[in-house]
Amino acid sequence: MEQQKALDLSFFEQSTIEVAKGLIGMHLVHELDGVTLIGRITETEAYLGVLDRACHSYGRRRTKRTAILYEEAGRCYTYTMHTHCLLNVVCEQKGQPEAVLIRAIEPISGVKEMERLRGKPHTSREFANGPGKLTKAMGITMADYGRLLTEPPLYFAKGDHTNASIVATKRIGIKGAGPCSHHPWRFIDGNSRAVSAYRP
């Protein structure tokens, strides 16, 4: 497979909603121990900062964990939930703490290594159809926190966005976010089976 072309920093400086939609069909690439792992992104969620009750920076909260959200766009925001590492990319301008959560991928390249990391065959619908599943398959850990995701070894690259049928739905698992839980800020490729089990 030819060398992947990383997305420019300007891509992540767009509105967070546009980034979340625009990443559907793009590639997530991890050059790990001599193997290039590539997954096609099929599901994302947008988190819109200080006014979004579901966002870690709601009300301008700032902790050691969330500090990276206030930095430049394109940075990696990883955190753990129920022992799983979740991958987010920081968006907008510095000081505007918004991010996109990567929720699911389809394996494209480096599949054998991804299967080894995940402990499951890539043909399984459950292989990477969730944020904790995809980080395990891609070898992404908390050590990647703060990394700039526009250059190797971990980055986003141009894929085939035009083949995606983008569907917007409510986000998953944020019932405590009040009215914000109803915003259609989750985006999936309606043509893909590799998305979270929840559908509207």
Swiss-Prot record:
CDD domains (UniProt xref): AAG
Pfam families: Pur_DNA_glyco
Keywords, sorted A to Z: DNA damage, DNA repair, Hydrolase
Root EC class: hydrolase
EC identifiers of the protein: 3.2.2.-
GO molecular function, one term: alkylbase DNA N-glycosylase activity
Gene Ontology annotations of biological process type: base-excision repair
PANTHER family attached to this UniProt entry: DNA-3-METHYLADENINE GLYCOSYLASE
Family: Belongs to the DNA glycosylase MPG family.
Name listed for the protein in its UniProt record: Putative 3-methyladenine DNA glycosylase
Organism: Shouchella clausii (strain KSM-K16) (Alkalihalobacillus clausii)
